[in-house]
């Protein structure tokens, strides 16, 4: 998990990395589903949006994702938003407030990383 200090990073929580340090992912990647990569995606990065994290390659997403704490429309068109937090944003806010970071990239030490205990997918 990472949560950054800079203007971009302090407004999101990243997860889904099996290594816990921002370098892990699945063996396969998926096509980035956003407009700058030729795919229409009308979901805006508003508070509570869940989106795929990726490296510089637009088709490099695998298991990592991020939750947007504050509206971040500058991400629209370049990251694949795919859902929204429907309850529990107060927990996202608490994590952003209380979890200490160790560097300007927002890295959180393993012993301080929150654990997602339950996710429910709804239509």
Question: At which residue positions do the language-model features occur?
Answer:
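Glycine-rich, pocket-lining loop/helix-strand segments that form or immediately flank
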Residues: 11-43
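Single conserved hydrophobic/aromatic residue that forms the stacking wall/gate
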Residues: 1-9
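Cyclophilin-type peptidyl-prolyl cis-trans isomerase
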Residues: 39-123
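Generic detector of bulky aromatic hydrophobic side chains
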Residues: 1, 25-26, 99
């Amino acid at each position: 998990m990472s949560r950054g200090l800079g203007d971009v990073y302090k407004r999101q929580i990243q997860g889904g990395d099996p290594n816990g340090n921002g370098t892990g992912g699945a063996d396969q990647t998926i096509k980035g589903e956003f407009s700058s990569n030729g795919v229409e995606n009308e979901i805006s990065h508003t508070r509570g949006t869940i989106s795929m994290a990726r490296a510089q390659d637009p088709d490099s997403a695998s298991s990592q994702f991020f939750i947007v704490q504050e509206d971040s429309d500058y991400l629209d068109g370049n990251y694949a938003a795919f859902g929204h937090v429907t309850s529990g944003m107060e927990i996202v806010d608490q994590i952003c407030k209380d979890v200490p970071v160790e560097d300007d990239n927002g890295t959180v030490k393993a012993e301080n990383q929150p654990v997602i205990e339950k996710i429910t997918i709804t239509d």
